[in-house]
Amino acid sequence: MYAVFGLTRSEVTPHEAAAARYKHRGVIDRQGAAMTSRRAPDGGLNLDDFMRRQRGRHLDLPYPRGYTLFVCDVEETILTPRDVEYWKLLVVTQGQLRVIGTIGLANLFSWDRSVAGVAADGSVLCYEISRENFVVRAADSLPQLLERGLLHSYFEDVERAAQGRLRHGNRSGLRRDADGQVIRESACYVSRVLLRHRVTPGKQEITDAMFEAGNVPSALLP
């Protein structure tokens, strides 16, 4: 099912406006609209309710044209549990991440779409698979993503990544201002950690615990 955004902006808040557009197109009922307008403590949507009600749906994004958010759990994305655990280790997530689905053109297969997750500060981050994996800030919040679509800087950051112009998202790769505060980056590489000891192929099993301990790189790029 596709959710088509209308043009009417008659509600007071962006959350209620988005809900009204969904309802206008017959996508969700009154109860669903009430859920969409209810704020979580950080001012965003209640993620648990959002995931429960929208799971399995393509939600059209206002920008760019043809892009959708397919709401699903991490099991329906290309990422493995190892990749998600290492994604959480990036400073930009502040140690918390909730995968909410995939973003991309509606006709693309799941593994060709970026994986979207909500970080501790409420921002929406996209995990991109490339020669060197990277994470890009897609929106300042989930309500903003649904209301406006991807940030216009998103594709500029993807291009910077392709040109090798990003920093790594671990603590050693961070930039700080004169007061020692971390300068927020809109995109960063996912560092591929080095093996701390030799692994003998065929004789030693590579486990999730080894990955989480920082002994092996992404499961997608061995």
Curated annotation (Swiss-Prot):
GO cellular component, one term: viral tegument
Spans through the membrane: none
Keyword Ubl conjugation: yes
UniProt modification remark: ISGylated; ISGylation regulates UL26 stability and inhibits its activities to suppress NF-kappa-B signaling.
Listed InterPro entries: US22-like (IPR003360)
Pfam families: US22 (PF02393)
Entry keyword set: Activator, Host nucleus, Ubl conjugation, Virion, Virion tegument
Subcellular locations according to the entry: Virion tegument; Host nucleus
Domain of life: Viruses
Note: Isoform 21 kDa is first detected at 6 hours postinfection. Its expression increases at later times, when the additional 27kDa isoform is also be observed.
Family, per entry: Belongs to the herpesviridae US22 family.
Subunit structure: Interacts with UL25. Interacts with ISGylation machinery components ISG15, UBA7 and HERC5; these interactions inhibit global protein ISGylation.
Function text: Plays a role in the inhibition of host NF-kappa-B. This inhibition affects both the canonical and the non-canonical pathways. Blocks the induction of host IKK phosphorylation. May also influence the normal phosphorylation state of several tegument proteins including pp28 in virions. Also suppresses virus-induced ISGylation independent of its own ISGylation.
UniProt protein name: Tegument protein UL26
UniProt lineage: Viruses, Duplodnaviria, Heunggongvirae, Peploviricota, Herviviricetes
